[in-house]
UniProtKB/Swiss-Prot annotation:
UniProt protein name: Oxygen-dependent coproporphyrinogen-III oxidase
Keyword Thylakoid among UniProt keywords: no
InterPro entries referenced in this protein's UniProt entry, alphabetically: Coprogen_oxidase_aer, Coprogen_oxidase_aer_sf, Coprogen_oxidase_CS
Family designation: Belongs to the aerobic coproporphyrinogen-III oxidase family.
Catalytic activity: coproporphyrinogen III + O2 + 2 H(+) = protoporphyrinogen IX + 2 CO2 + 2 H2O
Species lineage: Bacteria, Pseudomonadati, Pseudomonadota, Betaproteobacteria, Nitrosomonadales
Annotated Gene Ontology cellular component terms: cytoplasm
Active site: 104
Subunit structure: Homodimer.
Positions contributing to substrate binding: 90, 106-108, 256-258
Gene, per the UniProt record: hemF
EC supergroup of this enzyme: oxidoreductase
A Gene Ontology BP annotation from the UniProt entry: protoporphyrinogen IX biosynthetic process
């Protein structure tokens, strides 16, 4: 296990992604370095009211402490009483154009140590796409990039992590997926550190190729008030998932993380409506019938 090596990679990944996104948007991200009083800190890179991105954040954090919050030890009682160290890059991008999908990507490393005992460590991460108006070619492209990221580690990873993503990014109280998925993994520590690190690194390294071509293709499509209205309504689902179900959000808030950085994933303009559903056969209804289905996208390619 080499924590310093992972941290160096994550800092570099954040810089590469922010630079790539600045080239697409034409506006700069605000870089905000912060310290965590209990140990650690990070850098939040945020764009608001950009040319393409209405709001977006690319966050690096490295936190450590003497004990873990309840959200971490509930599922893993063996971690109770151990010191911890965690580092990760997490991003969410909300484009202004409703035809351009929201995207989330995260790669992280966690280690818990205790004197006289072997360290407990694991990697986690993934990326997933949340369209408002879906395009099959975008879904295929995104899932192919996810598969390409995992292919060097073995054929078995993509189907496993794709299924995991569909199950994780699911709003149980709505009985619907958050988006069209991608890949998701957690607790990855087999067969060894180097293999797990390589896999996680490949996911991070494939992000720009997975998302930027879609953003470029959709950023200038004409839209009106109707599309913006539906986008704001569907963004409500994003808020619901992040605040009710997302383990990373809960861990961050319970472990004394930086609230501004944790909640930068939330969209800037959102609407809720009582008991609303789109008209049958409408472009808005197509999102539900054709895209929010947990289907396998790659045979289409």
């Amino acid at each position: 296990m080499n924590f310093a090596q992972v941290k160096d990679y994550l800092v570099d990944l954040q810089n590469r992604i922010v630079t790539g996104l600045e080239q697409v948007d034409g506006q700069s991200f605000r870089r905000d370095t912060w310290d965590r009083p209990e140990g650690g800190g990070g850098t939040s890179c945020v764009i608001e009211e950009g040319n393409v991105l209405e709001r977006g954040g690319v966050n690096f954090s490295h936190v450590f402490g003497k004990g873990l919050p309840a959200s971490a030890t509930a599922a893993r009682p063996e971690l109770a009483g151990r010191a911890f160290e965690a580092a990760g890059v997490s991003l969410v991008l909300h484009p202004r154009n409703p035809y351009a999908p929201t995207v989330h990507m995260n790669v992280r490393f966690f280690a818990a140590t205790k004197e006289g005992a072997e360290p407990v460590w694991w990697f986690g991460g993934g990326m997933d796409l949340t369209p408002y108006y879906g395009f099959e070619e975008d879904a295929v492209h995104f899932h192919q990039a996810c598969k390409d990221a995992l292919q060097p580690s073995g054929e078995e990873y993509y189907p496993r992590f794709k299924k995991w993503c569909d199950e994780y990014f699911y709003l149980k109280h709505r009985k619907e997926p958050r988006g069209i998925g991608g890949v998701f993994f957690d607790d990855l520590n087999q067969p060894d550190f180097a293999t797990c690190f390589n896999l996680t690194r490949s996911v991070g390294d494939h992000f720009l190729a997975a998302y930027v071509p879609i953003l470029q293709k959709r950023r200038d499509l004409p839209y009106g008030e109707r599309e913006r209205d539906f986008q704001a309504y569907r963004r409500g689902r994003y808020v619901e998932f992040n605040l009710v179900w997302d383990r990373g959000t809960l861990f961050g808030l319970q472990s004394g993380g930086r609230t501004e950085s944790i909640l930068m994933s939330l969209p800037p303009v959102v609407k809720w409506r009582y008991d609303w559903s789109p008209a049958a056969g409408s472009p808005e209804a197509k999102l539900y019938t054709d895209f929010l289905t947990g289907r396998d996208w790659l045979p289409l390619g």
